[in-house]
Amino acid sequence: MLRGSIVALITPMNEYGHVCETSLEKLINYHINNGTKAIVSVGTTGESSTLSQEEHINVVMLTLEITNKRLPIIAGTGANATSEAILLTKKFENTGISACLTVTPYYNRPTQKGLYQHFKAISENTKIPQILYNVPIRTGCDLIPETIIKLSKFKNIIGIKEATGDLSRVQKIKNSVHKNFFIISGDDTTFLDFIQLGGHGVISVTANIAAKIMSNICHLALNKNFKLARFMNNKLIPLHQGLFHEPNPIPIKWLAKKIGLIASDTLRLPMTPVSNKTRLILEKALYFSKITAK
């Protein structure tokens, strides 16, 4: 079972908008050396929506190669067409990828029946373990607990990344699924409460630049030391909040460059560079967190 701090890894690009392998390697080694438990490659934070499918696959495979079995790799493989999600997921079978993170179909807003059939089809047509991903603010549809519980019965659907921020869902899901089905927060601002209610960790944006402290907080929380975990997390709250002052991954890429983890904070359109107003917010949050240059 995946537990603890899992990073939703950014995809570093050079000034021309091409994937920067040097920065990617530096970033991955930073996580290996600072307690991150797994890497999500080319999810939302990894700019999956602006990479071609060829680039998407290449970044995941490069991440796998650099990591060299030192951490589990989870590949983002969601799509708004079920057939496309199946094809992309199958690309990672027999590669060494530990699991695929499959977001709910975005834009077309299916019913709960449609969502069930979508994930059922992926499960039945692929062998690799699947992690469901629910983030209604981005996709326009909500995978409700009752549907998650039904889907948990499929052998290769092993968990859920729950990014609604609705803490009432944690125990509702946990009390109705088998013991090996893991429930991971996808919301840095509420992840500690999420773990206290029975969750198993977080897929974190903040961890991109705060790997060690996020790993330590999760370790403390999973071992029921919530007093110290909260004390440590309090230093990160302005950062958790500031990272979503503009759409992810705009702020986190700027911060990763600022502290020297990546060489450039280049994004692809329609994502644009961070505003001066947000930079000030992020600089204050960085100072408060005491995170230093790498």
From Swiss-Prot:
Localization, UniProt: Cytoplasm
Pathways per UniProt: Amino-acid biosynthesis; L-lysine biosynthesis via DAP pathway; (S)-tetrahydrodipicolinate from L-aspartate: step 3/4
Signal peptide bounds: none
GO cellular component, one term: cytosol
Sequence positions that bind pyruvate: T45, I203
Molecular-function GO terms, alphabetical: 4-hydroxy-tetrahydrodipicolinate synthase activity
Gene: dapA
Domain of life: Bacteria
Protein name: 4-hydroxy-tetrahydrodipicolinate synthase
Organism: Buchnera aphidicola subsp. Baizongia pistaciae (strain Bp)
UniProt site positions, description: Part of a proton relay during catalysis: T44, Y107
Disulfide bonds: none
Subunit structure: Homotetramer; dimer of dimers.
Family: Belongs to the DapA family.
EC id: 4.3.3.7
Keywords on record: Amino-acid biosynthesis, Cytoplasm, Diaminopimelate biosynthesis, Lyase, Lysine biosynthesis, Schiff base
